Every structure is written in C-alpha cells, then in structure tokens.
A protein has these predicted regions:
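Phosphate/pyrophosphate-binding loop motifs in nucleotide- or prenyl diphosphate-using proteins
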Residues: 138
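Interaction-mediating elements
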Residues: 119, 131-134, 159
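Feature responds to low-complexity, polar/acidic, surface-exposed segments characteristic
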Residues: 1-96, 100-127, 141-154, 165-172
Length: 172
C-alpha cells in the first residue's frame, strides 16, 4: 500500500492492535461492515465513534483524497448516531490524540492547553491539549510554514512514522 495514500480508520486500527487490550471493544450499534480491530481501537479509546460526515468531518478515504486536493467546496456536516466509519479518514488532530493515548503517559490531572502554531485557531478545543503534547513529545511536527493543519487527512506513511516514534518513546 502506498505510503502517500490517506489512511482509513480501519487501517489505523489494525496498526494499533498490538497496543490494545482485546477485551475492551466498542459494543455500540453499527450497521457498517468493519473488522474487530476498529471495534477494539474504539473500545480502548484510541479512536472515537464518529457522528459527522463531510469535508470538515469524516468521509471515505477516496472522498478525503479529493478534498485534500481542493476539489470539494462547502461544509457538509450531517448529524448521525455515532458510527465506526471504517472507511473514514483520520485527521492530524485525531492522530495527535491517538499518539497520546498510545504513548502510555498518564496526564489525567494535567491542565489543558492549545498548541503554539500559526493555525492554532483551527484546532478543535477538544483536541488542543493532545495536539500540543504530541508536538512537545516530538510525535508530530509542524509544517514548514508553522501550521499544524489539524483537519488535513493523515497518510499511511505519516501514521506509521508517528506510531514508530510513539513505540520508541514507550519502549515497545
């Protein structure tokens, strides 16, 4: 699989499986065809069930690639019951949360913060602390222009690199 392709939630879940407790699985209703890896990744808190679709939320990997190239306009967010969305893409701000959940650092009582980057205003509040920490720990980095690009879909190569840095940090 090419490293520059956008990673799907199912593919990322498969990469996370060695770090997960298989007894923890998402038992919510979902009529989508997905593998056990995604249910386990959600059950372990690495990924969250999604309830949005559209360019600002989660869409199929093919649609995300079109969006990343700038061929989609307008915001089309629709509310749905939480779903696993195995073919949905993973944004950089979500990947920051995955990295922090997987690294083994307990920061439950830590204060919240927002990242220091040129586009900090684009980082959703619920992801801000994880983005700041993923940057601090070196799991992720800013673009050359000083932006984090929180809503840009993550590629397979990026996800592998981030998880390798997390594994090195955690001694795995």
């Amino acid at each position: 699989m090419p490293a520059d392709r956008i990673i799907t939630r199912e593919q990322l879940a498969c990469m996370l499986l060695p770090l997960a407790d298989p007894a923890l699985r998402w038992e919510g209703y979902d009529d989508e065809d997905c593998g056990d890896a995604l249910r386990i990744a959600v059950g372990n808190g690495f990924l969250a069930p999604e309830n949005r679709t559209g360019p600002e939320g989660h869409v199929s990997g093919a649609h995300a690639e079109v969006h990343a190239k700038g061929h989609v306009s307008g915001a089309h967010a629709y509310d749905h019951a939480p779903r696993l969305m195995p073919d949905g893409h993973v944004t950089r701000q979500e990947m920051a949360t995955v990295a922090m959940q997987a690294c083994g650092v307990n920061y439950r009582n830590a204060s919240s913060t927002m990242p220091v980057c040129a586009d900090a205003a684009l980082v959703n509040n619920n992801y801000g602390t994880n983005v700041a920490r993923a940057l601090y720990f070196g799991f992720m980095s800013l673009e050359p222009d000083g932006c984090f690009k929180p809503r840009r879909p993550v590629t397979i190569g990026e996800a592998a690199g981030i998880l390798n840095r997390v594994a090195d940090f955690a001694g795995i």
